[in-house]
């Protein structure tokens, strides 16, 4: 697919027992999770039950049942952060990790129809119109995870203010986490981040 664009990437870890109330600038810097020179932006939010921290390098979301690290730049620093943060909360009952990549591509020349329309299906025939858009959900095992790909039609706004028809490709590499192996399995998944990213690029450039 031509002109696909990566618009987001994040790592989300689900578990019971995170303590958002301690996740602040002092905690992150004293724990060596971020450097002393990295500035926490003023629009960051810190409460006992909800934390959202904005920096030029990442956005961090932490709630009692999960945390999510959204990459802005420096993927290697991000991977180190996720591993270090997970260890700081080693008492958490970890349940799953998801590594996620989001892309958009212009839905030109009925691309969504070319990819997903099934002419032999009576359901699809009901949507065989000029205004119809199509998507899909695909899943399979990949390395130590299950890859889930969701494709949805959406719209964007061009610089001139007009709408742009797009397809949103959302890749999720999901791994269940069990007991005493949880931190080891988190590390395995995080170490596969680059392989997951490359595999998504391969699919999007096919």
Predicted features by range, described:
Residues 19-24, 76-80, 109-111, 179-187:
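Short, conserved charged micro-motifs
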Residues 1-71:
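N-terminal low-complexity, intrinsically disordered segments
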Residues 145-206:
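Mixed-charge, glycine-accented linear interaction segment located at domain edges/termini
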Residues 68-106:
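Aromatic- and glycine-enriched beta-alpha-beta binding-site module
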Residues 13-16, 70-73, 103, 171-177:
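Short beta-strand-to-loop capping motifs
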């Amino acid at each position: 697919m031509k002109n696909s664009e990566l618009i987001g990437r994040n790592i989300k870890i689900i578990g019971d027992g995170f303590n958002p109330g301690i996740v602040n600038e002092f905690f992150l810097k004293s724990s060596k999770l971020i450097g002393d020179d990295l500035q926490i932006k003023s629009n960051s939010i810190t409460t006992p039950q909800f934390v959202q921290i904005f920096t030029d390098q990442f956005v961090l979301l932490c709630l009692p049942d999960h945390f999510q690290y959204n990459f802005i730049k420096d993927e290697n620093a991000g991977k180190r952060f996720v591993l270090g943060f997970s260890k700081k909360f080693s008492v958490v009952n970890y349940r799953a990790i998801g590594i996620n990549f989001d892309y958009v591509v212009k839905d030109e020349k009925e691309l969504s129809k070319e990819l997903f329309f099934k002419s032999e299906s009576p359901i699809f025939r009901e949507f065989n119109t000029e205004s119809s858009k199509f998507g899909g959900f695909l899943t399979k095992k990949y390395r130590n995870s299950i890859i889930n790909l969701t494709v949805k039609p959406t719209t964007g706004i061009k610089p001139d203010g007009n709408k742009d028809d797009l397809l949103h490709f959302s890749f999720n590499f999901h791994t269940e986490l069990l007991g005493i192996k949880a931190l080891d399995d988190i590390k395995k998944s995080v170490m596969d981040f680059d392989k997951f990213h490359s595999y998504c690029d391969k699919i999007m450039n096919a």
